[in-house]
From Swiss-Prot:
Pfam family, any one: Ribosomal_S19
SUPFAM superfamilies: Ribosomal protein S19 (SSF54570)
Family, per entry: Belongs to the universal ribosomal protein uS19 family.
Protein's job: Protein S19 forms a complex with S13 that binds strongly to the 16S ribosomal RNA.
Name of the protein in its database record: Small ribosomal subunit protein uS19
Gene3D superfamilies: 30s Ribosomal Protein S19, Chain A
Keywords: Ribonucleoprotein, Ribosomal protein, RNA-binding, rRNA-binding
GO molecular function: rRNA binding; structural constituent of ribosome
One Gene Ontology term, aspect cellular component: small ribosomal subunit
One Gene Ontology term from the biological process aspect of the record: translation
Length: 95
């Protein structure tokens, strides 16, 4: 179920404060965050945000097309390595 439209989009307040402070100071640096559920706002365009995927922080450069989406959409948490079998064993070996 999606969020109620009367509540508005969610964004972590600390993350938004960091973005606004960087916009005022006109600086660009990577911001680490664990807030995968935060919505991307227009103020975030041009910044790089390192989103936690459960193991490490994945750098995500914010563009105009990403506005309205969630940060977690751009940092996948699961990686498909393929099904088992003889062919998979040969492909998976590191020489």
């Amino acid at each position: 179920m999606s969020r109620s439209s009367k509540k508005g989009p969610y964004v972590d307040i600390k993350l938004l404060d960091k973005i606004e402070a960087m916009n005022k100071a006109n600086e660009k640096r990577v911001i680490r965050t664990w807030s995968r559920d935060s919505t991307i706002f227009p103020q975030m365009i041009g910044h790089t945000i390192a989103v936690h995927d459960g193991r490490r922080h994945v750098p995500v450069y914010i563009t105009e097309n990403m506005v309205g989406h969630k940060l977690g959409e751009f940092a996948p948490t699961r990686f498909f390595r393929g099904h088992g079998g003889k062919k998979a064993d040969k492909r998976g070996k590191v020489k």
